Amino acid sequence: MNTQPLERALAAFREVLGTAHVSTDESARAAAETATFATTHRIPAIISPGSAAEVEACVRIAREHGVPLYPVSTGKNWGYGSRVPTSDGAIVLSLARMNRILDFNEELAYVAIEPGVTMRQLVAYLNDRGSRLMLSVTGSTPDSSVVGNICDRGFGAGVNAERIAHICNIEVVLPNGERLNTGFGRFPGAQTASIHRWGIGPQLDGLFTQSNLGIVTRMTIWLAPRPRHHEIFYFRLRDERRVEAVTDIIRDLKLQGLPRASVSLWNDYKLVSMKGQYPWQEAAGKTPLPEALLAKLRRAWGGAAWLGGGAILAASQDQIAAERAVIRKALHPHVDKLSFVGQRAARVARLLQRPVQRLTGFDLSEVVRAYEQSPHLGIPMERNIRSAYWRKKAPPPEQTDPDRDRCGAIWLAPAVPSTGKHVGTALRIVRERALAHAFEPGISVIFATERCANIVVALMYDRELPGEDGRAMACYQDIFDRLAAQGYLPYRLGIQSQSALPAAQSSYGTVVGALKRALDPDDILAPGRYDFRHEWPPADN
């Protein structure tokens, strides 16, 4: 292997960035090559630009020397591949140093940030300013990148949950080293650059999400006003067959605009993994979790197979009362228990949580936490990531890092029509195949929009156990293939599945290939990432 181009590129990177921001350290590279499932791609170096101008310079150097780059924001894309590139030999270009908040407008409710800004940082910024605005947060670690998640089209909680639909004015460094501004942002002094999604002419923003056509170095994100009043609601389903009827009800409510916030369902396997770890001793070392033990663990939330929840975000108590009445009328006949928790109920729950848990096993502290620290209010939470430690035998450390701690976690995220029939079919496939492979099917169903349900399947295991990586990936692929055969395709892919989609029946691959060859003729930017190159026609065509 000729290493001279790489060595020359590294020397040029050091000249631009400084030695401290170009790392070939073996331990740093090994950490960047590690995900929450087995990977094989190797990383020769990690470079860390601190500005868009330095990103431009790095891209030009990479192109000059024919060295591929793989951009990451903070690298916490856990469950989908973390920081590991989609091709072997790519240099990781970390944007974590680019963590400035560049513009903020309280009146028009937007913020412009760099890709290194985390959820924790942005929420603290808003709180420190006494802002009335909030961010739609995700279930990932608060230290994950806001821009990175949006560029992978992740969903959040609350209003603006479809985060990709609430951005504009993106700044992108193209693979030739030039800089592009989308929408009205391309015009100096444009007054609507940060508040008008489309601009004038072809709308280009989507080209730079789930793609390798450019590096996003700045993004404007629309925020939502923090509600003057809020109330959470949750319900239990003892019989999982009721999920289908409840799906139809939630869809009809969402089509009417109620509630404005997202609604979610979580199955029992998902809930137990968020609340604790696998009971290895009680299960006598066997997997998957025995039904009797699952039933015992369910008591923490009243024995239900599924738990659902959402929030009413309102300008007045009268509005809350009106929305509550509509939601109650729709859901009550179809669920086992429907509860609404406002300020007064949360206060009572706080007083009664110990005696109630002692007498019934039901944990009211969860109710209090759900009201006071609801993600629907733009408050990040870490419990979802702690579920990555479900099958680990050691307790999660205070500072979680699933990559470092050899947690096994693979996310599968099919998009499904919001009808009971479709959601029920998809859930049965996931449950049956996961259990057949001896894994617990941890499932969330997120209703962030009116017509489509996003199902997130979490397959958890311990990477330190021999053979588990292979078994987990076989389970993942089995579920992936069976869902795809029914037309339930993922809205987001891990690095291992970039070529796993069914064959397309249109010229999509031809167009994507033409764009890639035009913008990145040297193929130096994240080769293989969401470019579906197996569908490209030959270059001479």
Swiss-Prot record:
Keyword Lyase (UniProt): yes
Protein name per UniProt: 1'-carboxy-chondrochloren decarboxylase
Coiled-coil boundaries: none
Entry keyword set: Antibiotic biosynthesis, FAD, Flavoprotein, Lyase
Pfam family name, one: FAD_binding_4
KO phenotype (gene knockout): Inactivation of the gene results in the accumulation of carboxylated chondrochlorens A and B (pre-chondrochlorens) and abolishment of chondrochloren production.
Domain FAD-binding PCMH-type: 39-226
Pathway noted in the entry: Antibiotic biosynthesis
Reaction(s) this enzyme catalyzes, per UniProt: 1'-carboxy-chondrochloren A + FAD + 2 H(+) = chondrochloren A + FADH2 + CO2; 1'-carboxy-chondrochloren B + FAD + 2 H(+) = chondrochloren B + FADH2 + CO2
GO annotation (BP), single: lactate catabolic process
Record field: transmembrane: none
EC number in record: 4.1.1.129
Inducers of expression: Encoded within the chondrochloren biosynthetic gene cluster.
Superkingdom to which the source organism belongs: Bacteria
PANTHER family, sorted: ARYL-ALCOHOL OXIDASE VANILLYL-ALCOHOL OXIDASE (AFU_ORTHOLOGUE AFUA_3G09500)-RELATED (PTHR11748:SF114), D-LACTATE DEHYDROGENASE (PTHR11748)
One MF annotation (Gene Ontology) recorded for this entry: D-lactate dehydrogenase (cytochrome) activity
Gene3D superfamilies (UniProt xref): 3.30.465.10, FAD-linked oxidases, C-terminal domain (3.40.462.10), Uridine Diphospho-n-acetylenolpyruvylglucosamine Reductase, domain 2 (3.30.43.10)
Role this protein plays: Oxidative decarboxylase involved in the biosynthesis of the antibiotics chondrochloren A and chondrochloren B. Catalyzes the decarboxylation of biologically inactive pre-chondrochloren A and pre-chondrochloren B to yield mature chondrochloren A and chondrochloren B, respectively. Cannot decarboxylate free L-tyrosine, 3-chloro-tyrosine or a number of chlorinated and non-chlorinated analog substrates containing variable N-acyl chains.
